[in-house]
């Protein structure tokens, strides 16, 4: 087949031709289109590798799978991540460990898709332990025991087995770059530390990264930020590097605010800041070296006469996607920290709203709070009611719980982790109702009430004497 014939066939795909007025900068926008991947053989002819249907569809990353055995507190689990995924369980059952592994693999997918590292880099010299797991300080779990870890992602599969780490490229076209944010339980420290950099350096690397984003978020909301509860407002004095909380009749420095404010403000403001970056399809900041490489690659594509215009357009689109955010992976430890139940609801509504700002976003959180589960059930029920309602009923539902705070039941996964070997990880979703199981909501209160009733019976006997 001649090159001319091949060009004609490729043009039959009817790929939208991009605006070339400003060369490649104008290409860095829009939704993804899968393209025909080609390579040139020794004779200069095209060799087709894969041909993808050109269609817009919901992405498959909402069903990413994690399998873990014998990794620290994590005994044996096989789970699917969805748009909203939550973990509940006692202390020390591995909720945070699972969340940190997910964060690690999503970050790894990100940097590999940007071609910042070769696949072999992380496969060699035990870097999975010393670089990746050490970032979250879960590297010690590899020393003890012989863990098995497998993550089936959108773009790559990762496997750690018998001390070896293996990465497999699934050959998928990228749709954009993820902004992966791990919000640690220690986040209140960034509120009280403010500019005490030495204190922050003692934290895990993940906490230091979160602290940096908190600084960026404070600067972004220079005119102020409204907390989702109690009518409170945060204002940042950049000149003196000081945060202030404004209430109805008072003003207090963030360092002197309540523990609930200190833990929730960094989480909420960073989540909203990053979700806005993703919604705006913000370009990733590149170093001069990275910009030079990008410009060189674009020039190579545009000057190659063997590529048809449609192929050039699609190849440059792929370059654009590798440098533009398209989703926020927001991983939050215990969003309810130090908050009254009513405030817990407002904080969760804020997180869910930010998550809903893009179809690609994902929210993962751990919790100890039965109130959080009840709130999630309210959000699921809101979506179920809205889906079946008439126009008039929908207006009523919107007044009770707006759509931006609702969660479709097919978009949520919930898992209970326990200390029992036999039932370590179980789904907390009732398959009949699509809601978080009533047992998960009532287990703690049931234990408390049983103790109360026993004590009340003892008390009643003392009165009968």
Please name every model-derived segment.
Residues 346-348:
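Conserved hydrophobic alpha-helix in the ABC-type ATPase nucleotide-binding domain
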Residues 362-371:
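Conserved H-loop
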Residues 333-334:
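Walker B catalytic acidic pair
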Residues 152, 181-325:
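Extended helical coiled-coil dimerization/tether regions that scaffold
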Residues 340-341:
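Conserved D-loop-proximal element of ABC-family nucleotide-binding domains
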Residues 1-3, 14, 20, 25, ...:
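P-loop NTPase switch/coupling surface
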């Amino acid at each position: 087949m001649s090159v001319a014939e091949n060009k004609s066939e490729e043009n039959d795909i009817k790929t939208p031709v991009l605006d070339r007025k400003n060369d490649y900068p104008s290409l860095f926008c829009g939704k993804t289109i899968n393209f025909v991947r080609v390579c040139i053989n020794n004779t200069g002819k095209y060799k087709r590798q894969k041909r993808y249907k050109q269609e817009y569809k919901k992405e498959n990353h909402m069903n990413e799978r994690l399998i873990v055995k014998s990794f620290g507190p994590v005994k044996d689990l096989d789970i699917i991540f969805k748009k909203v995924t939550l973990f509940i369980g006692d202390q020390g059952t591995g909720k945070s460990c699972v969340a940190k592994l997910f964060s690690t693999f999503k970050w790894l997918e990100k940097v590999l898709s940007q071609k910042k590292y070769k696949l072999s880099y992380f496969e060699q010299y035990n870097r999975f332990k010393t670089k990746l797991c050490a970032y979250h300080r879960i590297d010690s779990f590899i020393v003890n025991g012989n863990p098995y870890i497998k993550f089936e992602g959108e773009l790559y599969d990762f496997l750690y087995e018998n001390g070896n780490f293996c990465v497999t490229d699934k050959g998928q076209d990228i749709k954009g770059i993820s902004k992966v944010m791990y919000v640690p339980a220690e986040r209140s420290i960034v509120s009280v530390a403010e500019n005490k950099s030495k204190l922050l350096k003692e934290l895990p690397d993940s906490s230091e990264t979160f602290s940096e984003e908190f600084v960026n978020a404070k600067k972004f909301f220079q005119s102020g930020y409204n907390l989702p509860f109690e009518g409170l407002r945060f204002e940042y004095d950049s000149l003196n590097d000081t945060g202030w909380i404004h209430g109805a009749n008072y003003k207090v420095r963030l360092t002197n605010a309540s523990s609930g404010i200190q833990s929730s403000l960094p989480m909420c403001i960073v989540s909203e800041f990053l979700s806005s970056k993703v919604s705006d399809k913000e370009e990733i900041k590149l170093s001069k070296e990275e910009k030079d490489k990008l410009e060189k690659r674009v020039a190579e594509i545009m000057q190659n006469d063997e590529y048809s215009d449609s192929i050039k357009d699609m190849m440059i689109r792929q370059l654009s996607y590798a440098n533009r955010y398209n989703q926020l992976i927001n991983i939050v430890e215990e969003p309810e920290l130090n908050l009254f139940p009513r405030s817990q609801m407002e904080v969760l509504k804020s997180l869910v709203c930010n998550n809903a700002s893009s179809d690609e976003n994902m929210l993962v959180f751990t919790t100890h709070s039965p109130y959080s589960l009840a709130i999630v059930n309210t959000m699921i029920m809101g979506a179920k009611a809205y889906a079946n309602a008439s126009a008039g009923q929908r207006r009523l539902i919107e007044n009770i719980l707006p759509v931006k705070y609702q969660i479709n039941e097919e978009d949520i996964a919930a898992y209970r982790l326990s200390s029992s070997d036999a039932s370590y990880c179980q789904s907390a979703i009732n398959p009949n109702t699509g809601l978080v199981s009533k047992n998960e909501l009532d287990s703690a209160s049931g234990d408390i009430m049983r103790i109360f009733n026993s004590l009340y019976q003892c008390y009643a006997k003392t009165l009968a004497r």
